[in-house]
């Protein structure tokens, strides 16, 4: 992004911030809690950007003063040296701030702030793939707990030999989608299964879909498009087990999506949860379609976000996790223990780098 474009966008952000300040002082806005919350949230989002822009303006002024001092000190070598050092430090601070502001102005995914549903499905590899799906679920649970997110399994189909054929996990928290969206795709594991007597390495896979939570207004579902039936939920022994039909089997005819929900205690809760899952799945389909159209015009994403894309291999023998989008290796134990900060951070950095390159190319055009 060239300097003139950067300043223009920063001035626009500054004007928007000042306008929001005026709106917050308006009694009519103060009397409307919903509008007040919306305006206050947008003001909070812009405040760090505007503050950094003001810092940049101050540093630019100090740079001009330092340059003037360098010229005035040519007859005094010691003073000139001090002035040049001061100018060098100011220029360094200025460049760092410009970099920070440029990143802050990069296009944001409007869904980045949302909570998500993670759908993990066992792929190729039979029983070992089911065990691997369970390992991935625990990895994300540990990562979410570290960040203070609320991580809760809401639907699952257990496998006979352990692990899961599929599992849907609700992950609620701040900016969850902005991080976990890079986890969508095929996760491949290479290891010796516990049942392997010859010590041979097997390759298994599991797919991860990352679905941002959808608002009912955002994804409209017609009641005529649904087929809903109830079933008895299984569970540990007891007089009430299987006597009340609390499970919900929901089928969306236009998309062919089926959701079976048994985790909640009541039929109404399971129905609400099933509808929540269905909305997220339908939104994921919309996003996938939009991404496919966008990729035909440009290829600037870190990965496609498609659940069929092979994104990572976990090699137990070499204690190595390879992210194929980045071409970078990470320690296996670190990743599986839920320490995904380095991996996801590298994906975010690569995405920002590509976005900046695209903006630069647009400026040249």
Curated annotation (Swiss-Prot):
Peptide chain release factor 1 directs the termination of translation in response to the peptide chain termination codons UAG and UAA. Methylated by PrmC. Methylation increases the termination efficiency of RF1. GO terms for cellular component: cytoplasm. Belongs to the prokaryotic/mitochondrial release factor family. It is found in: Cytoplasm. The modification N5-methylglutamine is found at residue 239. Pfam families: PCRF, RF-1. This is Peptide chain release factor 1. One of its GO terms (molecular function) is translation release factor activity, codon specific. InterPro entries: PCRF, Pep_chain_release_fac_I, Pep_chain_release_fac_I_sf, Prokaryotic/Mito_RF, RF-1. It comes from Prochlorococcus marinus (strain NATL1A). Keywords: Cytoplasm, Methylation, Protein biosynthesis. SMART domains: PCRF.
């Amino acid at each position: 992004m060239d300097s003139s474009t950067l300043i223009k966008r920063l001035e626009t952000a500054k004007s928007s911030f000042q306008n929001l300040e005026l709106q917050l002082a308006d009694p009519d806005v103060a009397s409307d809690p919903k509008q007040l919350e919306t305006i206050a949230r947008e003001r909070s989002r812009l405040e760090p950007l505007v503050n950094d822009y003001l810092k940049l303006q101050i540093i630019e002024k100090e740079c001009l003063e330092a340059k003037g001092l360098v010229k005035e000190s040519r007859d005094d070598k010691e003073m000139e040296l001090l002035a040049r050092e001061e100018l060098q430090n100011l220029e360094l601070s200025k460049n760092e701030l410009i970099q920070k502001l440029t990143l802050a102005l990069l296009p944001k995914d409007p869904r980045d702030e949302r909570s998500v549903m993670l759908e993990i499905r066992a792929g190729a590899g039979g029983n070992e793939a089911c065990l691997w799906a369970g390992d991935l679920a625990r990895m994300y649970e540990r990562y979410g707990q570290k960040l203070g997110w609320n991580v809760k399994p809401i639907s699952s189909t257990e496998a006979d030999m352990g692990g899961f054929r599929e599992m849907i996990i609700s992950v609620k928290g701040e900016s969850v989608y902005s991080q976990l969206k890079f986890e969508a795709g095929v996760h491949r594991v290479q290891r010796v299964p516990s049942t392997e007597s010859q010590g041979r390495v097997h390759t298994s896979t599991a797919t991860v879909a990352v679905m941002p939570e959808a608002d009912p207004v955002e994804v409209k579902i017609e009641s005529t498009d649904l087929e809903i039936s109830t079933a008895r939920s299984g569970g540990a022994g007891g007089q009430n087990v299987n006597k009340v039909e609390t499970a919900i089997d929901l089928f969306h005819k236009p998309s062919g999506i089926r959701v079976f929900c048994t985790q909640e205690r009541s039929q109404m809760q399971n129905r609400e949860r099933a509808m929540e899952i269905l909305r997220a799945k339908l939104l994921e389909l919309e996003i996938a379609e939009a991404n496919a159209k966008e990729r035909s015009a440009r290829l600037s994403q870190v990965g496609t976000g498609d659940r069929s894309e092979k994104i990572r291999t976990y090699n137990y023998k070499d204690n190595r996790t390879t992210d194929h989008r980045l071409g970078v290796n990470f320690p296996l134990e670190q990743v599986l223990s839920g320490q995904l900060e380095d991996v996801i951070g590298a994906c975010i950095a690569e995405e920002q780098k590509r976005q900046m390159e695209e903006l630069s190319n647009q400026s040249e055009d």
